[in-house]
Amino acid sequence: MSNILQNIFIDYYEHILYELHPRQTEIENISKMIHCGDPSYGGAFFACPDCGELNFVPFRCNSRFCPSCGNMYNQKRSFHMSCKLVNCVHRHCVFTIPEELRIYFLNDRSLLNCLFHSVRDVVLRMFHKQNKAELFTPGFILVLHTFGRDLKWNPHIHALISEGGAGNHTVWRPCTHFDFRFLRNSFRKVLLDQLTNKIGKSFCKVKNEMYSKHAEGFYVRAKPNHCKPDVTIKYISRYLGRPVIATSRIDTYDGDNVTFHYTRHEDNQTITECIPALDFIKRLIVHIPEKHFKMLRYYGIYAKHHKQESKLHKCISSEKHRYLCKFYNWQNMILLTFGYDPLKCPKCGKSMFAFEVYYKKTALFEQYRKVMGYG
């Protein structure tokens, strides 16, 4: 049974191909999402050893653009993120860019790497300058969101930063003071310098305008939010791993127009928009990342082994990690996401086993082309 998002894309699939001229990665993700759960694309037969009941479970698309599979992916990703966290307070910071710069990142998506590199350099510098002998290194996770609540193109970085760092000699030093002025000015300088190196001299005029218009730096939200470890883990699952839009935010679709709602940042008012379906699709697909592009990245002590790592206490111990990993298998993820146990016999309730697996028939050349990466 298809969801409302699948229905919208199925109805407008030809319009997408011939009017919007989507990127290759957009076509691939849209096609996967449309056929997610389609039995004709393969699946597995499960049999009950007691009553002989057969149950067919279709394959899922595993696309992050799909609301169902994207939710499963985010649950797994949130779990692995939480296993890396040191047992300390973390601060949620948001690094934004002026509206005038957004078009550059839309026209050349490789520039999105500059956002990650700029935030990384600024955060590490803020900690390193506290003590040049110790070079305190925090643990931080950066997540790129290219969308605002209204679904329009608005690339920005969400950072989850430990309020403390590991030094060359000191195991851990707390750091509760984040220098707002340093963050704003340094982020502006580093990002504009990187963009100038990538784009060239043609960007110099824009760079000078940015310094004039944003004399106090680019906006960085870094207020203390008292994210204790247990709150941090819940926060990661709820916010950092969220999809572009949840199906619960889509109110109606009448075949021509889509009505959806969101909560406006400025005043927390619920805003309802009704726009043509094709415009709604355009707002969504622009946020599909290029293939193999990492939207989430680990830095500092979370990126690699640090000499003090063995002495640091994690939010989730290694024993608990091994235990919880058992619950993140295919069966339990289906149960958590879709609300049913695919291996439970619908008649007698006993556990079923895999009986046979079916795959969609494809030409040998198509399989070869996919493996070799042609086309």
Residue ranges of each PLM-predicted region?
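Beta->alpha loop/short-helix hinge microenvironment recognizer with preference
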Residues: 1-375
